[in-house]
């Protein structure tokens, strides 16, 4: 585990001159398909109307797993008020992302919120990342009730505030007070579906 983590850190710092350019905010969250260990798929838009915090993580990264536990605490406390934590694992050199691995970390860390996985291409597209851009891991994205991205980790070294529990609470408090979108507004958005993969 330590060897894999060291390799990931080395790879992340191998091209210091290149970085993920800051994406404009707020901006509408793109759609994202999340694969669940059960074989079902869930669209990110299924959570519209809630304040969503997504962590894109490497399963082999202890730091990513610590952030996942932070989101678990926030979900348990703030979930009734409209917070939805989501974790999405994706592959890295020396670190796969699949149903059995996701199931293992969910049970090991006792995570109570949705945890799934996807491929690196889908993550890059969602984050608007170019192939040569250095991606800070974990990537934490905060989406408001209307589906707008209000905060994102971005380029290395990222935004430590999005990995800190107290800072996240401060950021989330006003978002949770915002009014959820009306039913009419929701009808103008693409419908989210949950289905079994083939």
Please tell me what each predicted stretch does.
Residues 65-109, 120-125, 198:
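Structural microenvironment flanking redox-active thiols in thiol-disulfide oxidoreductases
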Residues 102-139, 143-145:
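Short, internal strand/loop/helix patches
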Residues 18-44, 113:
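N-terminal "domain-start" segment that seeds a small globular fold
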Residues 2-9:
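Sec-dependent signal peptide recognition
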Residues 53-54, 85, 140:
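Hydrophobic beta-strand anchors of alpha/beta hydrolase catalytic cores
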Residues 45-62:
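Short active-site neighborhood of thiol/selenol oxidoreductases, capturing the structured segment around
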């Amino acid at each position: 585990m330590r060897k894999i983590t060291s390799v990931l850190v080395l790879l992340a710092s191998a091209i210091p001159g290149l970085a993920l350019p800051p994406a404009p905010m707020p901006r509408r969250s793109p759609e994202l398909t999340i694969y669940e260990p059960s074989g079902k798929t869930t669209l990110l838009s299924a959570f519209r109307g809630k304040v969503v915090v997504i962590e894109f993580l490497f399963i082999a990264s202890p730091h990513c797993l610590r952030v996942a536990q932070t989101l678990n605490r926030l979900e348990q406390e703030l979930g009734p008020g409209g917070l939805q934590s989501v974790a999405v694992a994706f592959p890295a050199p020396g670190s796969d992302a699949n149903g059995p691995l996701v199931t293992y970390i969910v049970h090991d860390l006792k995570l109570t919120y949705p945890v799934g996985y996807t491929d690196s291409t889908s993550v890059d597209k969602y984050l608007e990342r170019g192939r040569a851009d250095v991606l800070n891991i974990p990537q934490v994205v905060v989406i408001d009730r209307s589906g707008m991205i209000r905060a994102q980790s971005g380029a290395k070294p990222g935004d430590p505030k999005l990995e800190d529990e107290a800072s996240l609470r401060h950021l989330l408090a006003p978002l949770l007070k915002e009014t959820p979108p009306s039913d009419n507004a929701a009808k103008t958005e693409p419908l989210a579906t949950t289905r079994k993969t083939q």
